[in-house]
Amino acid sequence: MKKRRSKKERQALLQQTIETNPFITDEDLAERFQVSIQTVRLDRMELSIPELRERIKHVATKNHEENVKSLPLEEIVGEIIDIELDRHAISIFEVKLEHVFQRNQIARGHHLFAQANSLAVAVIDEDLALTAKSTIRYIRPVKLGERVVAKARVEDVENDKGRTIVKVRSFVGEELVFTGTFEMYRSSNYSEEGNSL
């Protein structure tokens, strides 16, 4: 039988775990430390660690202010948690009541597309980036209460058309739910090509 950790040990490990992965849920922490969710919440309160939503918001705001050039914060669908311009980006989107069809609690597809598309725009290292073309695929329906993690990767910065190719894969947990390939127009191309997309 495994010996239970003392409160002090548990809180130190909890703090370290959240510092390593600020997006871990209270439920996952409770399972990891074999305590109730309420115990995790009390530990977080004692340690002055904010709830998951506030931790995500803090990281998203910090990343956006430091890195995103092409979109204002309020125009991004989902919250950007990691970004390296012209390389990769990650965002989280919580599916709420206003995002689903009332009769079946399934997320409307345009929300998943908007998360992926705004992430593809945000990852571009330009003041202006527009979607010229996209190819998307919905793999399975996303439901109310699920958290969608979109991961964008820049595949080709300047292809033969002078466009940037961004691939986005969206997951719920480990399960792939959406994929998209976005051909992005960059503002640096505007002066070279005139105003055609």
UniProtKB/Swiss-Prot annotation:
Signal peptide: none annotated. GO terms for biological process: fatty acid biosynthetic process; negative regulation of DNA-templated transcription; negative regulation of fatty acid biosynthetic process. The keyword Repressor applies. Pfam families: 4HBT. Keywords: DNA-binding, Fatty acid biosynthesis, Fatty acid metabolism, Lipid biosynthesis, Lipid metabolism, Repressor, Transcription, Transcription regulation. One of its GO terms (molecular function) is DNA-binding transcription factor activity. The keyword Repressor applies. Belongs to the FapR family. Transcriptional factor involved in regulation of membrane lipid biosynthesis by repressing genes involved in fatty acid and phospholipid metabolism. NCBIfam families: PRK04424.1. This is Transcription factor FapR.
